[in-house]
Regions:
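Hydrophobic ligand-binding cavity/cleft-lining segments
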Residues: 1-40
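Short, hydrophobic/aromatic-rich segments at coil-to-beta transitions
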Residues: 42-50, 68-77
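A short, structured loop/turn motif at beta-sheet edges
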Residues: 11-15, 42, 66-71, 90-99, ...
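Beta-strand/loop substructures that line and gate deep hydrophobic ligand-binding cavities in soluble
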Residues: 77-130, 135
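Hydrophobic-ligand-binding modules of eukaryotic lipid transfer/binding families
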Residues: 1-8, 129, 133, 141
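Generic structural detector for well-ordered beta-strands
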Residues: 7-11, 38, 52, 64, ...
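Short, surface-exposed coil-to-beta transition loops
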Residues: 3-5, 58-63, 84-88
Length: 141
């Protein structure tokens, strides 16, 4: 699946935006379909985050933080059903505020996974856009 991304402009500086991307008490406030979000230890490269999503009867994901550079960006990776997903956030200063870009890249390793990607790609793109717009609303609320 080709990667896709979405950007939002927020009227807050990167130092105020960045904590909302991974912190346990903040992510559930703007992420749809999220039942549980647990960070195992201090945030940083190698930290594991467990997400339980309410979609498809409930999906548990074990994500690993693979890049962590406050307040400029972070990345996570997880694998589910033969699909490896990397999500990257870039936070750039933009005037008095910030531009936040999230890029999602998924690679399938088997036939079944390759067949699933076209089915879920549209839903993932919509979710990414809606969640980032919700983040903007929460931050500027």
């Amino acid at each position: 699946m080709p990667s896709f991304s979405h950007s939002i402009d927020v009227s807050k500086p990167p130092s105020e935006v960045f904590p909302w991307l991974l912190e346990q008490d903040k992510v559930p406030q703007w992420t749809s379909d999220l039942e549980r979000y647990d960070v195992d230890g201090a945030l940083g490269v190698g930290t594991h985050v467990t997400q339980k999503l309410t979609v498809a009867g409930g999906i548990a994901l074990d994500m690993e933080i693979t890049a962590y550079d406050p307040p400029r960006g972070a990345a996570t990776a997880f694998e589910t059903n033969g699909v490896k997903v990397v999500s990257e956030y870039i936070v750039e200063g933009s005037g008095a505020g910030s531009r936040v870009t999230q890029t999602l890249d998924a690679k399938a390793s088997g036939f079944t996974a390759k067949m699933l990607i076209p089915i879920v790609q549209g839903r993932l793109e919509t979710k990414l856009k809606e969640d980032l717009e919700r983040l903007k609303t929460v931050l500027e609320g």
